[in-house]
């Protein structure tokens, strides 16, 4: 029973890595810098409710930010988001 549970955990971890790793790679520039505009929205770890904006690959979209943590694809206004992430 313990071996089956361990193998299930390894399989789950493998699937999570296969799904997550390409997304992280696609956010990197060739020189190793992360393009914050390609990161997914991340509401953070707290339970506050701040209206913020993130770039979804096409346009800026409003989301609720918890106030702590998350990533840098987070802007206080739609204008700031578009200025940083929208390509001319």
Swiss-Prot record:
It is found in: Secreted. Residues 28-33 form a propeptide. Keywords: Disulfide bond, Protease inhibitor, Secreted, Serine protease inhibitor, Signal. PROSITE patterns: BPTI_KUNITZ_2 (PS50279). Disulfide bonds join 37-85, 60-81. Residues 37-85 form the BPTI/Kunitz inhibitor domain. GO terms for cellular component: extracellular space. Residues 1-27 form the signal peptide. The keyword DNA-binding does not apply. Belongs to the venom Kunitz-type family. 03 (sub-Kunitz) subfamily. This is Kunitz-type U15-theraphotoxin-Hhn1d.
